[in-house]
Amino acid sequence: MLSQTRAAFFALIIFTFFSGQYAFAGQNTSADSSKMNVYFLSGLGADKRIFSNLKLDDDISVHHIEWAKPLKKETLAHYAGRIISQIDTTKPFQLVGVSFGGMIASEISEIARPEQIVIISSTSTGIPVSRFYRGLTRFLLLSPFAGPILKSANKTTYKYFSATTPESKSLLKAILHDTHTKFLKWALARTGSWEKKQRADNLYHIHGDQDRLIPIKLVKPDQVIAGGGHLMVYIQADEISAILNRKLMQEK
């Protein structure tokens, strides 16, 4: 159990650190009442790049949520309550969240009523961690060296993100460069203490069996992607696209 909690917290540290800067491009599609509004929350970069390889059905109206600057000591629930202003809740909508974005999507579902939540390479509930690793979190939050060290692209980060191609390595390097240190530290503190116990009823979880950041043995996904790592939404986009099109269009 201790080894599992250590692995879980290591995963939380890494994937939270790369949760992205709060300066995204705006929504990329115009409103169309005949289409299903789907809001995408990236956990891995400063913009929608992580979703750039997806091929989605024309009847899906894609919107990208912009990260906001977190308030001091703000909880994930309160943060979700602020960014929900970007969602038109007067019309049916769905949420798709990757990694950290999946956690925020789960918190949004406690406030609004999405038709469905799809999380990818994420967790639907908090993962328990040991006191030792909680202490490690506090140390990293106080260390002036945490940001520069953990924002560097190297063999270790490539390995844990399963960035095996030149294209995926280039993307990961750019993502790390764009990550805002203050956002990074806030996200680390909040995800490390996330205590959500109940999975949302209308949640669908897609996870890779080779995810090194959030090992599959620590979560209970609905759909397992063979050979999928943490960046599978980008690297195995065709397979993920097929699943998303099927699931999202079911609720239309």
List where the protein language model places each region.
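Active-site loop/oxyanion-hole signature of alpha/beta-hydrolase fold enzymes
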Residues: 52, 57-94
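Flexible "cap/lid" loop of the alpha/beta hydrolase fold
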Residues: 113-146
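Catalytic histidine-centered segment of alpha/beta-hydrolase-like enzymes
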Residues: 73-74, 228-243
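Short beta-strand/loop motif that positions the catalytic acidic residue
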Residues: 205-207, 211
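Conserved alpha/beta-hydrolase catalytic His-Asp/Glu region
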Residues: 148-195
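Bacterial N-terminal signal peptides
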Residues: 9-20
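Conserved HGGG/HGGXW glycine-rich cap/lid loop of the alpha/beta-hydrolase fold
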Residues: 26-70
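Gly/Ala-rich beta-loop-alpha elbow adjacent to hydrolase catalytic centers
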Residues: 96-105
